[in-house]
């Protein structure tokens, strides 16, 4: 058997974290078994589906590197096929027309709720031996309902949750085509999985209740039943269902926030799955190790600190050239153009060990390419009357030296010693004048990257105002 998995999002919004994890697990299982991974866009909700959402899904998949072997297939382009299968079910007695009006169904629901019963369709239009059906009304277009078995149980061995059994008497007759002829979600999913030869359906556990209905439909069609694996939901840091209030939930928002795709993938892989104590691994390793026996059936909890830790690791490991291309774009988006005057890769190398996102690096290094606006409080704190003469003398001495870290440190240390000061008394005001902040890497390293001309110009502009 060739493994065939699928990821089937609805384009009613962005690709969210839960969907991305489902896609990752489906992709990894196909890759592990040298199978095929199919991308299917379930766009039958015409009112809510948008081209922008489709593009966001495709962008998210591509950014993560989750390549698909077939597709993307669009359900709206398969309407003729669905109608053929509906006709087959009607012809074979597995489906029937139901002429209930909305008012009838609402009244039935209200009555059942008053009687403490579970609201469900009562089968009044279901054809059965010896049953007399109501007269067909002239003014009500019918829906098509699937004739769900009345007896027995639907049993499947869920690859994550174990054996699940649902009594058929708990299931009513599912609408598979609306009054306007359009097929419904549960029906389209079944036909697609059948036609595409899906062997393993990996999806969120919010679909567990759909599974018995879909199995019954597949059996009526004489189709092979795929294996099902229902993944637990993802909770936020606070133990509540992950939502926008927990921060970014869109995959592309993580890209915008400065996360690397390999960090996001590594983190998603560990949401509900484990391989011993391994925390950091490549996607090749993940595909090799992946299996359902290591997926927990309990809810996974999102931990932003862990994601940041992983992202920091991958930033440290990434090629500087790759980071430079990305960070240059982030700076450009902020209106800051990177020039050849300052070595961007050298600047990133100076800052990446202290950053957990690319945005942090971009924000920290902006001063290399645009002179900072220095807060008055910093000037007041560090450029004190007693230190200004020292800085003025240091400016003169720095004009004619070799511009290396070693020589800069020597000259700054000389000013410290000559004036019987501690090193920070000189280094901190220098840092403020050059970077606009009292937080930065070693000041001599910053000065080398800024260059002699720019470093002296920044010192001079501050001292001219404050001396």
UniProtKB/Swiss-Prot annotation:
Keyword Cytoplasm among UniProt keywords? yes
InterPro entries, per the entry: aa-tRNA-synth_I_cd-bd, aa-tRNA-synth_I_codon-bd_sub2, aa-tRNA-synth_I_CS, aa_tRNA-synth_I_cd-bd_sf, Glu-tRNA-ligase_bac/mito, Glu/Gln-tRNA-synth, Glu/Gln-tRNA-synth_Ib_cat-dom, GluQ/Sye
Q: Which UniProt keywords apply?
A: Aminoacyl-tRNA synthetase, ATP-binding, Cytoplasm, Ligase, Nucleotide-binding, Protein biosynthesis
Q: What class of enzyme is it?
A: ligase
Q: Locate the motif 'KMSKS' region.
A: 241-245
Which positions, given as ranges, span the membrane?
Answer: none
Main location class: cytoplasm
Q: Motif 'HIGH' region: which ranges?
A: 9-19
Give me the residues that bind ATP, please. 244
- What molecular function terms (GO) are annotated for this protein? ATP binding; glutamate-tRNA ligase activity; tRNA binding; zinc ion binding
Q: Which reaction does it catalyse?
A: tRNA(Glu) + L-glutamate + ATP = L-glutamyl-tRNA(Glu) + AMP + diphosphate
- Domain of life from the UniProt record: Bacteria
Tell me where in or outside the cell this protein is found.
Cytoplasm
| Protein's GO biological process | glutamyl-tRNA aminoacylation
E.C. numbers: 6.1.1.17
- What Gene3D superfamilies does its record include? 1.10.10.350, HUPs
Q: Which GO terms describe its cellular component?
A: cytosol
The family line of this record is:
Belongs to the class-I aminoacyl-tRNA synthetase family. Glutamate--tRNA ligase type 1 subfamily.
Q: Describe the protein's quaternary organization and the partners it interacts with.
A: Monomer.
Its function? Catalyzes the attachment of glutamate to tRNA(Glu) in a two-step reaction: glutamate is first activated by ATP to form Glu-AMP and then transferred to the acceptor end of tRNA(Glu).
Task: State the protein's name.
Answer: Glutamate--tRNA ligase
């Amino acid at each position: 058997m060739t493994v065939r998995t699928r990821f089937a999002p609805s384009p009613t919004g962005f690709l969210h974290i839960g969907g991305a994890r489902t896609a990752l697990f489906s992709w990894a299982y196909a890759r592990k078994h040298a199978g095929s991974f199919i991308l299917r866009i379930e766009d039958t909700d015409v009112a809510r589906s948008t081209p922008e959402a489709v593009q966001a899904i495709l962008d998210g998949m591509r950014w993560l590197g989750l390549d698909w072997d077939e597709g993307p297939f669009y359900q709206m382009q398969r309407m003729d096929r669905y109608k053929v299968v509906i006709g087959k079910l009607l012809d074979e007695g597995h489906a029937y027309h139901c002429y209930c009006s909305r008012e009838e169904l609402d009244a039935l629901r209200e009555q059942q709720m008053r009687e403490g019963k579970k609201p469900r369709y009562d089968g009044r239009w279901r054809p059965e031996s010896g049953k007399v059906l109501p007269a067909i009304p002239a003014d009500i277009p019918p829906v098509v309902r699937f004739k769900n078995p009345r007896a027995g149980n639907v049993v499947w061995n869920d690859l994550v949750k174990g054996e699940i059994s649902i009594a058929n008497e708990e299931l009513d007759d599912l609408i598979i085509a609306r009054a306007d002829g359009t097929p419904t979600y549960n029906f389209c999913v079944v036909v697609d999985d059948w036609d595409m030869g899906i062997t393993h359906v990996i999806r969120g556990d919010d679909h567990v209740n759909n599974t018995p209905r879909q199995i019954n439909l597949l059996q009526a069609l004489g189709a092979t039943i795929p294996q099902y694996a229902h993944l637990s939901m993802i909770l936020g840091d606070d133990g509540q269902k992950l939502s926008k209030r927990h921060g970014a939930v869109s995959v592309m928002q993580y890209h915008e926030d400065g996360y690397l795709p390999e960090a996001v993938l590594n983190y998603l892989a560990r949401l509900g799955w484990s391989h011993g104590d391994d925390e950091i691994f490549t996607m090749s390793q993940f595909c090799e190790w992946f299996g359902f026996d290591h997926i927990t059936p309990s809810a996974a909890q999102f931990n932003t600190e862990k994601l940041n830790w992983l992202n920091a690791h991958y930033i440290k490991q990434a090629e500087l050239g790759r980071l430079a291309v990305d960070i240059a774009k982030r700076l450009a988006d902020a209106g800051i153009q990177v020039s050849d005057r300052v070595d961007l890769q050298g600047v990133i190398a100076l800052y990446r060990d202290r950053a957990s996102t690319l945005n942090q690096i971009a924000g920290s290094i902006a001063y290399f390419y645009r002179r900072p606006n220095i807060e008055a409080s910093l000037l007041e704190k560090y450029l004190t009357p007693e230190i200004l003469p020292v800085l003025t003398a240091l400016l003169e001495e720095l004009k004619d030296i070799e511009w290396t870290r070693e020589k800069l440190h020597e000259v700054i240390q000389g000013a410290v010693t000559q004036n019987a000061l501690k090193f920070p008394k000189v280094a901190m005001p220098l840092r403020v004048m050059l970077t606009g902040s009292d937080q930065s890497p070693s000041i001599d390293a910053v000065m080398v990257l800024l260059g002699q001309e720019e470093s002296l110009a920044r010192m001079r502009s501050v001292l001219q105002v404050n001396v």
